[in-house]
Structures are given as C-alpha cells and as structure tokens.
C-alpha cells in the first residue's frame, strides 16, 4: 500500500484497518 491513512501503529494496531489499512513502518497505509 502507498496511500497513508493518517494513523500511526507504533503502540496500537490500525483502527483504520476496518477500512483496509495495514501497518507498515509504524504507519498505517491503504493497499
């Protein structure tokens, strides 16, 4: 994924994961 979801995932998972975002390099990205 290359589109940032405006969310970090250093301490907690991506809340935006419900819309398809995933953690990459401590930042949530949409595939």
Curated annotation (Swiss-Prot):
Family the entry assigns: Belongs to the cyclotide family. Bracelet subfamily.
Mod. after translation: This is a cyclic peptide.
Tissue-by-tissue expression: Detected in seeds (at protein level).
Functional note: Probably participates in a plant defense mechanism.
Domain notes: The presence of a 'disulfide through disulfide knot' structurally defines this protein as a knottin.
InterPro entries, per database record: Cyclotide, Cyclotide_bracelet_CS, Cyclotide_sf
GO biological processes: cytolysis in another organism; defense response
Site of covalent link Cyclopeptide (Gly-Asp): 1-31
Native organism taxonomy: Eukaryota, Viridiplantae, Streptophyta, Embryophyta, Tracheophyta
Superkingdom of the source species: Eukaryota
Name this polypeptide is given: Cyclotide hyen-I
Source species: Pigea enneasperma
Cystine crosslinks: 5-21, 9-23, 14-28
Keywords for the protein's UniProt record, in alphabetical order: Disulfide bond, Knottin, Plant defense
């Amino acid at each position: 994924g290359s589109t940032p979801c405006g969310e970090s995932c250093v301490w907690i998972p991506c809340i935006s994961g419900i819309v398809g975002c995933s953690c990459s390099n401590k930042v949530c990205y949409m595939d």
